[in-house]
Amino acid sequence: MVLGVAAAWFAITKSKVRAIWCYLCMVVCFFAIIMGSSDNAYLALAALFGFLPLILFKSKTGIRRYLLIIATFGTVIQCIDFINQAYADTVIGLDSLFEILTNFNGLIYVAAGLWVAYIAACLLSKYSRNWTGSVSPALVYGWAGFLLLSVLLAGFLLFHANVGGNAEKYGALEKYLVFNDSWGTNRGYIWRKSFELYRDFKPMHKLFGHGADTFGILTVSKLGAEMPERFENAHNEYLQYFITIGPMGLISYVAFLGSAVTRMWKSLETKPYIIGCCFAIICYITQAVVNISVPITSPVMWMLLSIGMAACNQRNID
């Protein structure tokens, strides 16, 4: 969420001092996410990098800022990889999806190319008259089409690897594409068991759930020693609510978050500062697919959501 706020505000702010501060916060967040060695953080990154262009590609300043953001991310990866190799006997080694990225031999050239593209965009904006005009809406629509194709491609890869039985063709990506009990640090196991437990619910529980915060009680009493490790939550916020407060509660929760994001998104044209709150929530609801609501993050999420909604309802700001 902090990354969503920092990156979004950096992307749209006109104040140089605020831009520098947000940029530094964003860099620290990039380092923290990668060094945390948690793959679920990459879902938030995908949401951030995927949806920001829908706002930024409406102006050439936004295009330059976006190029700077992704170039910085690539540079951060290279820096951490260098530290990993130079101090291999001192630091704790990193793995997960980060390892796949660093093993890509062309990563350094991609990062360098992004910096070249950013510098070229800056030079064009300063010296070229043709670069001072408005940006065609086709760029935003083109990016939206790219996002749609990316989703379809991801769906095809999942189908090809799981239903088609072609898991061995994907090499290091196999553990991300093939769903089994060990997927996602045994998330696959508890997700499968969650649906099996739901299948045995009484009709009333199938509508309204087993009871708030009773997932651990349910798994311990029903699964017991069968579990390879003790699961007191589903490691999926939406599945957790599906089991504990039922489809009715889950639909209400998703509808509330979705309507809040939609309301903030529609207000970005007139109140661009809301973008920080909006992207914080977008990043949160994306990573919630493999995480649950915890006391250290939930209050921050609800606070940012409340600030964003209050700003939408505020008519005049001096």
Regions found by a protein language model. Name each.
Residues D181-F231, Y238, I245-S252:
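TM-adjacent membrane-interface loops and short helices in multi-pass inner/ER membrane proteins
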Residues A88-E99, G164-S182:
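Extracytoplasmic catalytic-loop and juxtamembrane helix elements of membrane-embedded
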Residues R315-D318:
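Short, charged juxtamembrane terminal tails flanking transmembrane helices
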Residues M1-A161, I243-G276, I281-V289, V300-A311:
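Alpha-helical transmembrane segments of multi-pass inner-membrane proteins
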Residues L197, F201, K222, A288-I292, ...:
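Phosphate/oxyanion-binding loops and surfaces in catalytic or ligand/nucleic-acid-binding neighborhoods
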Residues V2, Y189, H210, T214-I217, ...:
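Generic alpha-helical secondary structure signal
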Residues L97-G106, F179, W183, N233-Y241:
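Short aromatic-rich membrane-water interface segments that cap or initiate transmembrane helices
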